[in-house]
């Protein structure tokens, strides 16, 4: 029994040594794993920071592209016209910008920073919007279809006026800057050929008094372009502008003219005022006798 005790003690000491060795190895492994664990968060944080910086740079780049495209959409007239009707893609905006720059380049290399030319573009856009609103008002509010004589006359006059001012703006392009005040003066303009032919045909079939014919002859001599567009002194439409039954007689349709109009100075001188007889109380009675609603602006449109 005495011998067994040291053996037991020796085996117990060996177990203690193995336990201590395992503890030391475990401590060493624990230190290594803790070192690896302390290094992995730093590397992962660096990777995350790098990805975050890359995302911020990419977002700033996209913001610059979007801001530039929005500026181009505002500055290019054709893109500015379409931004309310449909959503423009980036490629379409860039294509419109290229087309606009080509147009400016073919115009002589001028107008890149010309404020007047840019204002003329926006005035043409305004006239197109007004033309579209007039057609919309006549169709929705007044209930006039496309074959109505009043709508046909008004649309034909506006289309003809737009083409005339387009040609006039092209003729005045080489004269330099046109002051804004001249756009509101009385510029001569040519009457519509359809209106001229119809008015001359209507005047041959009617008889007028000598005083009225003499007065109209003086007006035609002084202003030959305004003779076919001024309202008759009798207050009614008369035989000056007969009814145009078909819209196919118009040279440019409404949609194509709205898409093809260009810059031109708008002149209020072409829209003549009504005569005093047109505002007399007999005008509502005549309209009531005809069974049509009273439109005081109808006589002014008939003057076109």
UniProtKB/Swiss-Prot annotation:
Motif (YRPW motif): 294-297
Compartments where found: Nucleus
Keyword Repressor annotated: yes
Segments of this protein annotated with the region Disordered: 1-52, 197-234
Pfam families: Hairy_orange (PF07527), HLH (PF00010)
Keywords of the record: Developmental protein, DNA-binding, Notch signaling pathway, Nucleus, Repressor, Transcription, Transcription regulation
Gene Ontology MF annotations: protein dimerization activity; RNA polymerase II cis-regulatory region sequence-specific DNA binding
Function text: Transcriptional repressor which binds preferentially to the canonical E box sequence 5'-CACGTG-3'. Downstream effector of Notch signaling required for cardiovascular development. Specifically required for the Notch-induced endocardial epithelial to mesenchymal transition, which is itself criticial for cardiac valve and septum development. May be required in conjunction with HEY2 to specify arterial cell fate or identity. Promotes maintenance of neuronal precursor cells and glial versus neuronal fate specification.
Family: Belongs to the HEY family.
UniProt name for this protein: Hairy/enhancer-of-split related with YRPW motif protein 1
Source organism of the structure: Bos taurus (Bovine)
């Amino acid at each position: 029994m005495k011998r067994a005790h040291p053996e037991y003690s020796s085996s117990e000491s060996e177990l203690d040594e193995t336990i201590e060795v395992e503890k030391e190895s475990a401590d060493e492994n624990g230190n290594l794993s803790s070192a690896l664990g302390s290094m992995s968060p730093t590397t992962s944080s660096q990777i995350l920071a790098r990805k975050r910086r890359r995302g911020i740079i990419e977002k700033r780049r996209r913001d610059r592209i979007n801001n530039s495209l929005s500026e181009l959409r505002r500055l290019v007239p054709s893109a500015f016209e379409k931004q309310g009707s449909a959503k423009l893609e980036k490629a379409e905006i860039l294509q419109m910008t290229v087309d606009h720059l080509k147009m400016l380049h073919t115009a002589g290399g001028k107008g890149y920073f010309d404020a007047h030319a840019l204002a003329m573009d926006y005035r043409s856009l305004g006239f197109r919007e007004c033309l579209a609103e007039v057609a919309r008002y006549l169709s929705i509010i007044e209930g006039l279809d496309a074959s109505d004589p009043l709508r046909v006359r008004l649309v034909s006059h506006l289309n003809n006026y737009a083409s005339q001012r387009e040609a006039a703006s092209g003729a005045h392009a080489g004269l330099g800057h046109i002051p804004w005040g001249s756009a509101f003066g009385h510029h001569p303009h040519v009457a519509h050929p359809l209106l001229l032919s119809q008015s001359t045909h209507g005047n041959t079939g009617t008889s007028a008094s000598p005083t009225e014919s003499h007065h109209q002859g003086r007006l035609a001599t002084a202003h030959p372009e305004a003779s076919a567009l001024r309202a008759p002194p009798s207050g009614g439409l008369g035989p000056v502008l007969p009814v145009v039954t078909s819209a196919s007689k118009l040279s440019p349709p409404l949609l194509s003219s709205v898409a093809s109009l260009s810059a031109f100075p708008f002149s209020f001188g072409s829209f003549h005022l009504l005569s005093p007889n047109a505002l007399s109380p007999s005008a509502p009675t005549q309209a009531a006798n005809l069974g049509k609603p009273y439109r005081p602006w109808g006589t002014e449109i008939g003057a076109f």
